[in-house]
Amino acid sequence: MSREMKDSGIEWIGEIPKNWQVLHHKRIMSKIKEICDKYQGEDILSLTMRGVIKRDLENPKGKMPATFDGYQRIKQGNLLLCLFDIDVTPRCVGFIEHNGLTSPAYSQFEMKGSNNARYYDYLLRMIDNDKCFLHLAKNLRSSLTENDFGMIKTIVPPIEEQEKIAKYLDEKIYKVNTVIYETKKIIEEYKKYKQTLIMEVVTRGLDKKVELKYSGVEWIGDIPIGWKVDKIANVYKQRNDKVSDKEYTPLSVTKKGIVLQLENVAKTDNGDNRKLVKSGDFVINSRSDRRGSCGISPYDGSVSLINTVLEPIGTMNNEYYNYVFKTERFADEFYKWGHGIVDDLWSTKWDDMKSIYIPVPSIEEQQEIAGYLKEQIFRIDNMISKKELLIIELENYKKSLIYEYVTGKKEI
């Protein structure tokens, strides 16, 4: 028999079991803050989509401060919250698994009495998924003060139920996350296989028994004996006509190819100074931080000046070279020819690009290879899409599972 329910009075919670309480956050948890005056090698922790994790200081990603002096100490078993920029922060709550230091901008909360921090981690994650606190936030940075947070009402199951719910969700979520992790690994294997297949076929062709020779170009390696290599300048020429986006549809150069620019994309002041693109042109972004953004344009239009527009010369198969240019090894070669002040932000312009050597099979082989790869990549991408859909379904299942149990709509 289902248990008796009551209205919690909290919009994002709905009904809860009749014996559960509704209290302010400040009644069940309290904010603590201990500043570390001098860093002495403690673990540095960050709040991420994966929870509160240890940062790799030897191979850091993202911004790093000059010193960790002045960071705050955080304690295993507490909750870490980000109460600022909650509209754009992917995850605003995490359970602290290990002692360490973190940015003083975060807010640490310690549970009062025997309330279970794991339970409230799940509850607050459920609320954060839908950004339910956003309408309560103040100022341009969408922030909540710790006092504001303390005055927000929450639900309080009996301690025994908190513990049962937390334990049950730990077990269930672990199993789901394991499946998600394994599925992501399979997706990465498919993507690696796709890259390997493209590189092998565009440089060696479809005949496995053909005699090979060294191309003389390091990034290409061996090619069939009947093939040659040539500079890009002998296969494409640069289209460098300057136009306005008022007359020519603005296009975006993405990793998925050339697409119509979205209406909400931030516009620059250079709308009257763009490059002309004709349908069938190949367009590639010259900046290294846009690696892989390229493709054949299906549209007439215009692109920003950072892009290089290539017009095919003579008899060639544009689709074949589209595959060539999308290989990882070509991307390495392309950006190796670039120039810039910052190592990871180089630009490779036409004057550099035109001297890069590329394989040149016969036009018949180009067509055969392009047709074969189109079919194979469609099959691989379809398998990837199915796995990605499975991940979406599992993520939604996790959210549903957490919601139903932390709000008492399902009983363990």
Functional labels for PLM-detected ranges:
Residues 8-9, 23-37, 41-76, 233-279:
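Sequence-specific dsDNA recognition surfaces
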Residues 3-11, 100-107, 138-163, 287, ...:
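A short glycine-rich beta-alpha junction/loop motif
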Residues 3-36, 151, 159, 163, ...:
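Non-catalytic DNA-recognition/assembly elements of restriction-modification systems
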